Amino acid sequence: MSLQSRLSGRLAQLRAAGQLLVPPRPRPGHLAGATRTRSSTCGPPAFLGVFGRRARTSAGVGAWGAAAVGRTAGVRTWAPLAMAAKVDLSTSTDWKEAKSFLKGLSDKQREEHYFCKDFVRLKKIPTWKEMAKGVAVKVEEPRYKKDKQLNEKISLLRSDITKLEVDAIVNAANSSLLGGGGVDGCIHRAAGPLLTDECRTLQSCKTGKAKITGGYRLPAKYVIHTVGPIAYGEPSASQAAELRSCYLSSLDLLLEHRLRSVAFPCISTGVFGYPCEAAAEIVLATLREWLEQHKDKVDRLIICVFLEKDEDIYRSRLPHYFPVA
């Protein structure tokens, strides 16, 4: 077998194995008539003549070209693959880098960065449909009709909202968005300083409005910050409208970012002084009416309370807005 035949056979083997990156350089004098040329671009040399014709693929792509196509298409090459640098959220000072890094992770990979290990998955949170089986409250004339599907979209939970693994949690913030007391401070401490760094770029928030940030070290992917009204004593009509707007503005962001689960704390009922019973009526009416319009766009709306008295209030009022079907 001639040297030319042996080289051609070896080239075919290398191409089949996906290991051909550059064409072999023939030794002088062994391939009579082979002419070495260089293309007009900055590309690699091409080998013409009998050797060059035999080295071409059926599609007319030369040996080097086939290797280049392989690299472009992601076929095996010897070039090392670029790997995204891992970010340590406990020490990082770049919120943009950290936020981008987290977006590229799967749900399972994100767990490594949670501030807690005892987080609560969405599937572990019972729906109102499940919870209502043990509710003794009977409503003779509920305000709304029975709807099994809506009862599967709403939940009441007494828990630490910072530990919920949902798409977003809502923060009852102050207008600065830089952290404060109550649930606001808890969320900022759990998420870490990167949350405050991103909030600083939002330049405050008006009462009744909402803004969204990453969740960072929280199990929740996002935090929706809203500012409730300050209402000591009997709330005015405008304050009631502002509280309703807090929930609607937060839900608007949920849809805008295509998120499907969200947990709300009790907004304005802490240091802002809004009466718990009056707030519950607004919250339940707002969520019920919103779900009637958008039930196919979300999986769960969670009312997450921290105090037993708030749980009792919502448990007694839920049947009026979400009658047991």
From Swiss-Prot:
Q: Specify the cross-link site (Glycyl lysine isopeptide (Lys-Gly) (interchain with G-Cter in SUMO2)).
A: K138
List the catalytic activities from the record: 3''-O-acetyl-ADP-D-ribose + H2O = ADP-D-ribose + acetate + H(+); 2''-O-acetyl-ADP-D-ribose + H2O = ADP-D-ribose + acetate + H(+); 4-O-(ADP-D-ribosyl)-L-aspartyl-[protein] + H2O = L-aspartyl-[protein] + ADP-D-ribose + H(+); 5-O-(ADP-D-ribosyl)-L-glutamyl-[protein] + H2O = L-glutamyl-[protein] + ADP-D-ribose + H(+)
Q: Which GO terms describe its biological process?
A: DNA damage response; peptidyl-glutamate ADP-deribosylation; protein de-ADP-ribosylation; purine nucleoside metabolic process
Give the consequence of mutating D167A. Answer: Reduced enzyme activity
Write out the entry's keywords from A to Z.
Acetylation, Chromosomal rearrangement, DNA damage, Hydrolase, Isopeptide bond, Nucleus, Ubl conjugation
Residues reported in the UniProt entry to bind substrate: 159-161, 172-174, 179-184, 267-273, 306
Q: Which residues carry this modification: N6-acetyllysine?
A: K163
Cross-referenced InterPro entries, in alphabetical order?
A: Macro_dom, Macro_dom-like
User: What EC designation does it have?
Assistant: 3.1.1.106, 3.2.2.-
- Where N6-succinyllysine occurs along the chain? K96, K103, K129
Q: Which residues form the Macro domain?
A: 141-322
Q: What induces it?
A: Overexpressed by estrogens in breast cancer MCF-7 cells, probably via an activation of nuclear receptors for steroids (ESR1 but not ESR2). Significantly increased by estrogens in ESR1-positive Ishikawa endometrial cancer cells. Up-regulated in 17-beta-estradiol-responsive BG-1 ovarian cancer cells but down-regulated in estrogen-resistant SKOV3 ovarian cancer cells. Induced by androgen.
Tell me the subunit arrangement: Interacts with ESR1; Interacts in a manner that is estrogen independent but is enhanced by estrogen. Interacts (via macro domain) with AR.
The entry's linked illness reads: A chromosomal aberration involving MACROD1 is found in acute leukemia. Translocation t(11;21)(q13;q22) that forms a RUNX1-MACROD1 fusion protein.
Role noted for this protein: Removes ADP-ribose from aspartate and glutamate residues in proteins bearing a single ADP-ribose moiety. Inactive towards proteins bearing poly-ADP-ribose. Deacetylates O-acetyl-ADP ribose, a signaling molecule generated by the deacetylation of acetylated lysine residues in histones and other proteins. Plays a role in estrogen signaling. Binds to androgen receptor (AR) and amplifies the transactivation function of AR in response to androgen.
Q: NCBIfam families, alphabetically? A: PRK00431.1-6 (NF001664)
Query: What is the name of this protein?
Result: ADP-ribose glycohydrolase MACROD1
> Which species does this protein come from?
Homo sapiens (Human)
